[in-house]
Amino acid sequence: MAGHLASDFAFSPPPGGGGDGPGGPETGWVDPRTWLSFQGPPGGPGIGPGVGPGSEVWGIPPCPPPYEFCGGMAYCGPQVGVGLVPQGGLETSQPEGEAGAGVESNSDGASPEPCTVPTGAVKLEKEKLEQNPEESQDIKALQKELEQFAKLLKQKRITLGYTQADVGLTLGVLFGKVFSQTTICRFEALQLSFKNMCKLRPLLQKWVEEADNNENLQEICKAETLVQARKRKRTSIENRVRGSLENLFLQCPKPTLQQISHIAQQLGLEKDVVRVWFCNRRQKGKRSSSDYAQREDFEAAGSPFSGGPVSFPLAPGPHFGTPGYGSPHFTALYSSVPFPEGEAFPPVPVTTLGSPMHSN
């Protein structure tokens, strides 16, 4: 304790004992414990003497003054788990008006919160949470209507023989916007957001009406399906044309737009087909070159088990082998560093005992 006090304060006690005599305290020396007991926050009331060593003695940072927190509403109290017992003499006084506005201390002795939550934010949260009862009833009614319509849509679709993809394509024919099969599936399963469900419901309602009244809707849907299938058809290139493209690629891997147009005219292909073919061919070349480089690196590094198998004899002693095989027992291992010629361990034969003989 004395060493700690000497390190924290630039005061040194006199060599002698206490008193007013020659062994008493010298002029300008102050007892650290007395000095600590009189210290208080700037602008605040001092703490009476005789309380004991302050927080600096125990190696704990002092509490900040009350005005450093939220407008003087904070309370500086002892922290939990530091080994200090709260004392009545260490409490700071607060005005009665600020005591109600401050943070209440926990009953279990935990440290209080530094500042209070603004009342305006709490009011805004309450206003968000508290909804108008009429609006909540309207939302619930709309949700029930959406659930009933989703069931009706699914029943109508299955009855007429439409798939979810057919419904999406038919919406594209009728309203100019194609919806995916996933969107229709999520609508029927009520997995879309409330806003998207409300937007999609009028379109699906018109689809139900058209499906009931228009008998040609199925044919329209089939025609649209064929058109979409044609759009997704893969382009096939003849072997002769592919060979010509390969030769041109070796000469110029990245042709310009004018060169692509000239190649398309010569080979009788579309410009987009030629352009896409060159793009795909460049990507294929990059992949093959990277694979070849990795293979070369692997061959240059060599196998981790270079060199031939090296035979090491087992420990001396009898080794029981399989009956009928009288060859010496050796363990074949692969050495990471091959032995030079003439330095390999010569195989040492070990006497092997065969099957035990039964004597009469």
From Swiss-Prot:
Binding sites annotated in the UniProt record for DNA: R157, Q164
Compositional bias of type Gly residues: which residue ranges?
17-26
SMART domains, per this entry?
A: HOX, POU
- Gene Ontology CC annotations of this record: cytoplasm; nucleus
Residues of the POU-specific domain? 138-212
Recorded hits in InterPro entries, A to Z, give: HD, Homeobox_CS, Homeodomain-like_sf, Lambda_DNA-bd_dom_sf, POU, POU_dom, POU_domain_TF
Please give one Pfam family short name. Answer: Homeodomain
Coarse class of the protein's main subcellular location: cytoplasm
List where the motif 9aaTAD lies.
Answer: 4-12
Functional description taken from the UniProt entry:
Transcription factor that binds to the octamer motif (5'-ATTTGCAT-3'). Forms a trimeric complex with SOX2 or SOX15 on DNA and controls the expression of a number of genes involved in embryonic development such as YES1, FGF4, UTF1 and ZFP206. Critical for early embryogenesis and for embryonic stem cell pluripotency.
Q: What PANTHER family does the entry give? A: POU DOMAIN, POU DOMAIN, CLASS 5, TRANSCRIPTION FACTOR 1-RELATED
Q: What is this protein called?
A: POU domain, class 5, transcription factor 1
Species this protein is from: Macaca mulatta (Rhesus macaque)
What's the source species' lineage? Eukaryota, Metazoa, Chordata, Craniata, Vertebrata
